Curated annotation (Swiss-Prot):
InterPro entries: Papain-like_cys_pep_sf, Peptidase_C19, Peptidase_C19_UCH, USP_CS, USP_dom. Residues 57-517 are cytoplasmic. GO terms for molecular function: cysteine-type deubiquitinase activity; cysteine-type endopeptidase activity. The gene is Usp30. Belongs to the peptidase C19 family. Residues 68-502 form the USP domain. This is Ubiquitin carboxyl-terminal hydrolase 30. Deubiquitinating enzyme tethered to the mitochondrial outer membrane that acts as a key inhibitor of mitophagy by counteracting the action of parkin (PRKN): hydrolyzes ubiquitin attached by parkin on target proteins, such as RHOT1/MIRO1 and TOMM20, thereby blocking parkin's ability to drive mitophagy. Preferentially cleaves 'Lys-6'- and 'Lys-11'-linked polyubiquitin chains, 2 types of linkage that participate in mitophagic signaling. Does not cleave efficiently polyubiquitin phosphorylated at 'Ser-65'. There is a cross-link at residues 235, 289 (Glycyl lysine isopeptide (Lys-Gly) (interchain with G-Cter in ubiquitin)).
Length: 517
């Protein structure tokens, strides 16, 4: 039943409608025409307000302690996750800033060939809160436009791989560096002799050996650039071939077969990567010489073939270490499958055991010596220092030194065969020479045909202490950003790991001692 007030309102409305209907047609037309004009004006005002101020969701301010997200342009989560991971590496951002500054100083005209480095630098600085922006979501379509200028066919509506994009960016930056004018070097005699007064005469220089190699400024400063060593030893005569050096921008590690009841760790993947393998039917020059010396007639001896043992090591560790865990496998029918095993990793990573050392090199007995590399990021040490004592040496007694909370190097298998490993223990990072800190993790959810990339990364340091490293972690999925715990990060199924070189406690003490002197 309606209340008395509602009944009175209904009665008044009925009376007004009856009076309107009793009026003439001309009066009703004028009133309806005025209503149309009023409605049109109201609609125009509403549209103008929407155009000027926009919807409320577009004006969201970024919450304190978080970083901007990135809008998904179709299927660009692979790019968004990689950019968030790179922005969490201060050494890479600083190198980009120094590279663009040096390029601007050398160039006189417009910087038409520096699109990628400047675009990437502006994006990473905005994502690391170094640029003044209050927007909660940023647009990274400018990066795709620049990469298309480098003839990369990258569609924002097709699913791509974050690791492939990482190498696209590093190789494109190298192309940009190649277009940069070379810095005149003392050994570049030809450039130094290009003087006007020396035009009539041609000055030549004769040398018995090969010219001294000129330094490559970009490669020496590239934070993700490292070197692998390949060592081959004959099993018959034990002759060692010359060490071969290859460059890398990321370590792509296969995941070994898991043993039931024992977790897989990052150390297992690293050891599987450097494990020795036998290479059969290889010509050994030393065995051929020995066989030739043994003949009395001096007749020609056929090339002696033998089995070699090949092993990889890390010749030069970069400032920023990108580790790619290969989760692609193939079934017996040739179908691609994704491996979903959880690979345990820690916040800190010791790489001493995987570092290549010259034969006969003795580690320091007074602790490692830390040398500061000019131009490197704070707390990032890029000098080649001696490995810490105590790690297992070839032919040395096996000691129970545990790496990264996984297992002793002496207990790891010489060949990739499934064996039982001890339970994880707390590692000792204090005296490590090659110590890295986790900065970001890229995770892929889904299968080999479809999925989604998300990123765990450290929050940028505070403005009061910009050289510090934040302990607050963030979970980022395109434009969604929230806080996360370290335990959540370490429990994720990592696809890409971004580590950055830091000084251990012993190295920091050594640097402070030398500064006091």
């Amino acid at each position: 039943m309606l209340s008395s007030r509602a009944q009175a309102a209904r009665t008044a409305a009925d009376k007004a409608l009856q009076r309107f209907l009793r009026t003439g047609a001309a009066v009703r037309y004028k009133v309806m025409k005025n209503w149309g004009v009023i409605g049109g004006i109201a609609a125009a005002l509403a549209a103008g307000i929407y155009v000027i101020w926009g919807p409320i969701t577009e004006r969201k301010k970024r919450r304190k302690g978080l970083v901007p997200g990135l809008v998904n342009l179709g299927n660009t989560c692979f790019m968004n996750s990689l950019l968030q991971g790179l922005s969490a590496c201060p050494a890479f951002v600083k190198w980009l800033e120094e590279f663009t500054t040096q390029y601007s100083r050398d160039q006189q005209g417009p910087h038409t060939h520096q699109c990628l480095s400047l675009t990437l630098l502006n994006l990473l600085k905005a994502l690391s809160c170094q640029e003044v922006t209050e927007d909660e979501v940023l647009d990274a379509s400018c990066l795709l436009d620049v990469l298309r200028m480098y003839r990369w066919q990258i569609s924002s509506f097709e699913e791509q791989d974050a690791h492939e994009l990482f190498h696209v960016i590093t190789s494109s930056l190298e192309d940009e560096r190649d277009r940069q004018p070379r810095v005149t070097h003392l050994f570049d005699v030809h450039s130094l002799e290009q003087q006007s007064e020396m035009a009539p005469r041609q000055v030549t220089c004769h040398t018995r050996g090969s010219p001294h190699p000129t330094t490559n400024h970009w490669k020496s400063q590239h934070p993700f650039h490292g070197r692998l060593t390949s060592n081959m030893v004959c099993k018959h005569c034990e002759h060692q071939s010359p060490v071969r050096f290859d460059t890398f921008d990321s370590l792509s590690l296969s995941i070994p077969a898991a043993t039931w009841g024992h977790p897989l760790t990052l150390d297992h993947c690293l050891h599987h990567f450097i494990s020795s393998e036998s290479v059969r039917d290889v010509v050994c020059d030393n065995c051929t010489k020995i066989e030739a010396r043994g003949t009395l007639t001096g007749e020609k001896v056929e090339h002696q073939r033998s089995t070699f043992v090949k092993q990889l090591k890390l010749g030069k560790l970069p400032q920023c270490l990108c580790i790619h865990l290969q989760r692609l496998s193939w079934s017996s029918h040739g179908t691609p499958l994704k491996r979903h095993e959880h690979v345990q990793f820690n916040e800190f990573l010791m790489m001493d055991f995987y570092k290549y050392r010259l034969l006969g090199h003795k580690p320091s007995q007074h602790g490692p010596k830390a040398t500061e590399n000019p131009g490197s990021a704070p707390e990032v040490q890029d000098a080649q220092a001696a490995p810490k004592p105590g790690l297992s040496q070839p032919g040395a007694p096996k000691t129970q030194i545990f790496l990264n909370g996984a297992c002793s190097p002496s207990l790891l298998p010489a060949l990739p065969s499934p064996v039982a490993f001890p339970l994880p223990v707390v590692p000792d990072y204090s005296s490590s020479t090659y110590l890295f800190r986790l900065m970001a993790v890229v995770v892929h959810h889904g299968d080999m045909h479809s999925g989604h990339f998300v990123t765990y990364r450290r929050s940028p340091p505070s403005a009061k202490n910009p050289l510090s490293t934040s302990n607050q972690w963030l979970w980022i999925s395109d434009d969604t950003v929230r806080k996360a715990s370290l335990q959540e990060v370490l429990s994720s199924s990592a696809y890409l790991l971004f580590y950055e070189r830091v000084l251990s406690r012993v190295q920091q003490q050594g640097r402070e001692y030398r500064s006091e002197e």
